[in-house]
Amino acid sequence: MTMIALNREVETQSLKKLSLKSVRRAREIFSPVHGQFPQPDPESKRIRLCHKIQVAFGGVEPASKPTRIADHNSEKTAPLKALALPGPKGSKELRKSATEKALVVGPTLPPRDLNNTGNPGKSTAILPAPGSFSERNLSTAALMERMPSRWPRPEWHAPWKNYRVLQGHLGWVRSVAFDPSNEWFCTGSADRTIKIWDVATGVLKLTLTGHIGQVRGLAVSNRHTYMFSAGDDKQVKCWDLEQNKVIRSYHGHLHGVYCLALHPTLDVVLTGGRDSVCRVWDIRTKMQIFVLPHDSDVFSVLARPTDPQVITGSHDSTIKFWDLRYGKSMATITNHKKTVRAMALHPKENDFVSASADNIKKFSLPKGEFCHNMLSLQRDIINAVAVNEDGVMVTGGDKGGLWFWDWKSGHNFQRAETIVQPGSLESEAGIYAACYDQTGSRLVTCEGDKTIKMWKEDEDATPETHPLNFKPPKEIRRF
């Protein structure tokens, strides 16, 4: 057979014949009607229609006997009959299998109206079917565990309103921190000063000078009478609040310092900045303990009493967990695609959120597992995030948008827009820092129009006046 195949002559084709064949093929592919749909196939249409009827009416069977009408005073129920529906041609096998897979429904009551006798040849009762629910070929079985039923419903929160505006700074207000006693709070500004304000009255109590650049980070210790500040002048300072002066300075940053955090249980202060590292300092000795590197600027840092004790967010779009015992990275989160400019820990729960221009994401601790995105997209560069114990999270953007969220579900229940002060530009409506007081009932925002705004919940609001408009998502994103 092989020899015969080899000896068979190959038919030669002329160049003209090959050219005509190529032209014919091109016309078949690129003809003007190539974008039109082909004529429907009757056999395919019939099979598709039979399948749809089986899926929709697979649990119904044509009635064999007419249903008798019961007296309206009788307590007896109507006999169980099947709904009489016409089936497709040649669907005897489908109706036979439908009898075995009928929908389970309890006995139906007869109509109350005696005048409405109906057609005695048809019945609307449904037959019970044997077998478990998983054995039935019903289209609704796949909808039993839908996404909305499993998504947590948000709690109702009263809307927040602005009740006080503080003026005094001569530049953008970039940082804020509350006193542990909740009597005063401090703000740092681009005018290189730190101002201390009374929480109850909003009166300016003190102005501290010492930085030669804008103050980007503030923190007040709950274990000592110290306040820490960091700025664009590459300096980190420790202030004695009893003497109102600088008692220590921490030198080592090569560029401006963007963020600052205090460890809750150790005498350690953490600072991150433009030199792409987070530095760990000993408060008393002023020694640099560790240098925690990133690939770009470090914009946010968090400190926790348990592992991971240090969490940093960077311009390289990553979040890193650090082991403070050895100064080594424990994990790297790469869910974000943009700069991670702000992060916040929940005061009670073991979760934290990170804010970026692409989304606001919630992670669980200690492993950093992704929980979910917030259900709305704030189309701003988010500079500030804060969370209180009641589960109200607030985010502030560079365009003046102040959004309030439910922590549990990620539902955005309020969107507020700040109003710039007279004499300021519209571009100065950005929010650069936000912080709740120790009770979580008051909120302070620092803005680009050189003002500080204080917010509180609307006491007159009720669920009736401000109803909860919540729509659960249709799917969960995995990243």
Swiss-Prot record:
Domain of life: Eukaryota
Motif (DWD box 1): 269-284
GO CC, one annotated term: Cul4-RING E3 ubiquitin ligase complex
Renumbered residue ranges of the record's region Disordered: 458-479
Gene Ontology biological process: mRNA splicing, via spliceosome
Organism name: Arabidopsis thaliana
Family membership noted in the UniProt record: Belongs to the WD repeat PRL1/PRL2 family.
Short motif (DWD box 2): ranges: 310-325
Keyword Isomerase: no
Protein name, per record: Protein pleiotropic regulator PRL2
